[in-house]
Amino acid sequence: MKLVIAILSLVILALVLPVFFMPEPADLAIRQQQLPWVIEARPDGNTRALGLTLNVSTLADAKTAFGPDMVVAIVSEPGEVGALEAYVASAHAGFITGKLIFTARADEDMIAAMRERAAKTEYMESTTRKATLSPADLSTAMTLPVRAIAFIPSANLDRDAIVERFGAPADEIRANDHQTHLLYPDKGLDIILDTRGKELLQYVAPRDFARLTGPLGTAAQ
């Protein structure tokens, strides 16, 4: 009898517990909008991806959406002014986990001045340098709009999974023996399919797509 009661208790618990841990409808809607393949073209030529509107949503908006552990810094290679980036090491894009990098829209003069006032500069990998912003510049950076987003999913993606979620690409460019760029100019999306490493999803406004694909030697618009 005790065994029967114990089994019934476990069954009831299994049925009831999920109700308490189900996301609120509002939270569920937000997560669905943040899924990597939910991309909305806007009348102004921008796109909304991962729940953010490129060239409109700010780094502060990105921090609100993806958590307080966002690290903001200027990342540069030798001879370059660099880019103002925000990095989230562990993020949830809807129900998909991965790493996120947000690139802020800032001109070279602003970035150079921020580098001069940096609280700390250190090497990341090889010759790449990271400049930690001063408190005042960090406050300014958080008000700047996001012009590009890069997402590295934790799980490996294959071509079939990508086409199922994003549709067939408008063009493909093979960069080397293990990387292929799947291009979606209407969405402002470049997916790098990598047979040796992690896939990379790059989002920009469609009007900026030529800048993204320029280094690939393509005329995709």
Residue ranges and their predicted role:
Residues 2-23:
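Hydrophobic membrane-insertion alpha-helices, especially the h-region
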Residues 22-40:
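Ser/Thr/Pro/Gly-rich low-complexity linker/stalk segments immediately outside membranes or between
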Residues 26-30, 57-221:
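A cross-family detector of function-defining hotspots
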Residues 37-50, 137-147:
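Acidic/histidine-rich, surface-exposed loop or edge segments in extracytoplasmic proteins
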